[in-house]
Amino acid sequence: MARYTGPVTRKSRRLRTDLVGGDQAFEKRPYPPGQHGRARIKESEYLLQLQEKQKARFTYGVMEKQFRRYYEEAVRQPGKTGEELLKILESRLDNVIYRAGLARTRRMARQLVSHGHFNVNGVHVNVPSYRVSQYDIVDVRDKSLNTVPFQIARETAGERPIPSWLQVVGERQRVLIHQLPERAQIDVPLTEQLIVEYYSK
C-alpha cells in the first residue's frame, strides 16, 4: 500500500479528528466529506476499532505493514501493549523533529529527515522511521542551519509547547532526548485499547 499524500483535512474529516493540529479547514467542517457526510451512521465495535487504528496511522504517517510490525513489537514488551505502541510511534525521528518544534507538521518533519538535515549522536541519519533512544542527541547539520525551514523554526520557537521528555538547546536547535515518553506525556487524542482490540481478533 502506497503512502497517502493527498489532502490531510479530508482524512481528518473522515476520521472526525484533527490529524495535523490546528487544522482550520477541519474546524470549520468537522464531519465526513461527501454529500452524506452529516448523516448519522451506526458505529459498530469493529468500525470504532478500525477508525482508531487509522487515526494513529495517519497521525504518525505510517503505512499499514509497518504499523502492524510496531504493534507486534509492542506485544512483546513487558508494559501495556497500547502504551508501548504509542511509545514506539513517538520515538520515530520524524515525530521527535515535529515535537521539538523544528517542523510545523509531521509530514514536513518526515521530509526534512529524508532530505538529510539531521545527525543523531554525530551520525548522519535520513530515515524518518529511525528510532531514538534515551540520552540521544539530535543536531541540525551545519549546512542546514541557515536554510529557510530552520530560520522559521527559530523565529517561531515557543509557539507550540515542547514535551518534557525533550529539550531544545540554543540557536543550533540541538534536541536532547531525556527519556522516552510515558502515556501521560503523549497528547494525541487516541484510545489505544481499541487498536489493541482491533489486532487481537
UniProtKB/Swiss-Prot annotation:
A Pfam family recorded for this sequence: S4
All residue ranges annotated as the S4 RNA-binding domain in the record: 91-157
Keyword vocabulary terms for this entry: Ribonucleoprotein, Ribosomal protein, RNA-binding, rRNA-binding
InterPro entries (alphabetical): Ribosomal_uS4 (IPR022801), Ribosomal_uS4_bac-type (IPR005709), Ribosomal_uS4_CS (IPR018079), Ribosomal_uS4_N (IPR001912), S4_RNA-bd (IPR002942), S4_RNA-bd_sf (IPR036986)
Domain of life: Bacteria
GO molecular function, one term: structural constituent of ribosome
GO cellular component: cytosol; peptidoglycan-based cell wall; plasma membrane; small ribosomal subunit
Record GO biological process: ribosomal small subunit biogenesis; translation
SMART domains: Ribosomal_S4, S4
Family recorded in the similarity comment: Belongs to the universal ribosomal protein uS4 family.
Subunit details: Part of the 30S ribosomal subunit. Contacts protein S5. The interaction surface between S4 and S5 is involved in control of translational fidelity.
Miscellaneous information on this protein: Was identified as a high-confidence drug target.
Function, in words: One of the primary rRNA binding proteins, it binds directly to 16S rRNA where it nucleates assembly of the body of the 30S subunit. With S5 and S12 plays an important role in translational accuracy.
Name of this protein: Small ribosomal subunit protein uS4
Organism per entry: Mycobacterium tuberculosis (strain ATCC 25618 / H37Rv)
